[in-house]
A protein has these predicted regions:
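Bacterial N-terminal signal peptides that target proteins for export
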Residues: 1-7
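Cleavable N-terminal signal peptides
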Residues: 8-9, 19
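N-terminal signal peptide c-region/cleavage motif recognized by signal peptidases
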Residues: 14-16, 20
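Core dinuclear metal-dependent hydrolase active-site scaffold
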Residues: 22-90, 94-96, 159-225, 309-315
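Active-site neighborhood of phospho(di)ester-bond hydrolases with catalytic His/Asp-centered motifs
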Residues: 74-78, 100-113, 117, 133-135, ...
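A short, active-site helix/loop in glycosyltransferases that binds the activated sugar's phosphate group
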Residues: 137-146
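Cap/insert and terminal regions of metallo-dependent hydrolase folds
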Residues: 199-201, 209-310
């Protein structure tokens, strides 16, 4: 399988559509890799992306495309969904009119993961019956609260309830299984998704509180999951403690990138290279490819997901 590093965002957006790097039946595309609010970040005037937009980042989202069936599935509807669908159209154009989405899978009800649904309504795309796959509490939240309830009423979206650890067939070549994980669940459950093809299993897990809490709840630790899966896109919100000035980061539960790397340091290089860090905060230095922290991630045998990356899930 081949993991191809994406081009610079500006080049991607103006270039003609790119063919897959190899013959590939099911392909994953990284559309964004930042934390919910992206970068430059609101209330952060010193962010270098204000002066250089090329340093900006959009919130975390991936797409999985079944090239055989001509179907495209979006994972997370972010506040940057307009730009991200334009990127997807450049990398893997839709076969027909409209948004060309055959389903949207949402992990939880925090702004960076579902707020982009607002663009599917009559003020935006005026979408027609896009299936939106969510857990039961999340479904009730969307159905019972505006403006999301209007999307349901007008059938811009059609809610497809999920059940934990129960796979759904997205297309002939793709099955998706939600796994509940510990996180702030004010309005919905939080899940990661295992995306299964005939050749691979991929974990998409942008948000959780603690590897230990998840292992205790599920009975499976992170190292075991790395062994059992082929690719893992995991929470990299913070690189280490001390990133947020004036904040007690012990009160902000997310696995730190340094801790995750240390936990997996005993695994072989072949296993460590399965892990790709995603959902990094604007304060996390791995957002910059040339940073010492990004170099450290590579030196330890891991990778950092970047917008424009593509990964073949079924050759």
């Amino acid at each position: 399988m081949q993991f191809t590093r994406g081009l610079l965002a500006l080049v991607i957006l103006i270039a003609p559509a790119l063919a897959p790097a190899e013959e590939c039946e099911v392909e994953l595309f990284v559309l964004g890799a930042g934390q919910d609010a992206g970068a430059p970040h609101i209330g952060y005037p010193d962010d270098p992306a204000w002066a250089d937009p090329a340093l900006g980042q959009t919130a975390t989202s991936i797409a999985v495309v079944d090239h055989v069936a001509g179907e495209r599935f979006l994972f997370e509807a972010t506040p940057h969904v307009t730009r991200q669908l334009q990127l997807l159209d450049t990398l893997a154009p839709a076969d027909g009119p409209g948004l060309g989405l055959d389903g949207v899978f949402l992990t939880h009800a925090h702004i960076g993961h579902y707020a982009g649904l607002m663009y599917f309504g009559r003020e935006g795309a005026g979408a027609d019956g896009i299936p939106v796959f969510v857990m039961p509490r999340f479904a009730a939240f969307l159905q019972g609260n505006g403006p999301w309830s209007q999307l349901v009423k007008l059938e811009n979206i059609v809610i497809q309830p999920l059940a934990a650890e129960t796979p759904v067939q997205a297309s002939k070549g793709i099955h998706v299984t939600p796994l509940t994980v510990p996180h702030r669940d004010e309005f919905s459950e939080t899940v990661g998704f295992v995306i299964v093809t005939n050749a691979s299993k991929t974990l998409f897990l942008p948000d959780l509180d603690s590897w230990d809490e998840w292992a205790q709840a599920s009975g499976i630790d992170l190292a075991t999951r790395v062994v059992e899966l082929d690719h893992l896109f995991v929470d990299a919100t913070f690189f280490q403690d001390g990133e947020l000035t004036g904040r007690d980061m012990s009160e902000i539960p997310h696995p730190r990138v340094k801790d995750t790397m240390e936990r997996l340091s005993g695994l072989s290089p072949e296993l460590r290279q399965k892990v790709r860090f995603i959902h990094y905060n604007h304060t996390n230095p791995i957002r910059f490819p040339a940073s010492p922290e990004s170099a450290l991630v590579s030196a330890r045998g891991f990778d950092v997901a970047r917008a424009g990356d593509r990964l073949c899930l079924a050759p």
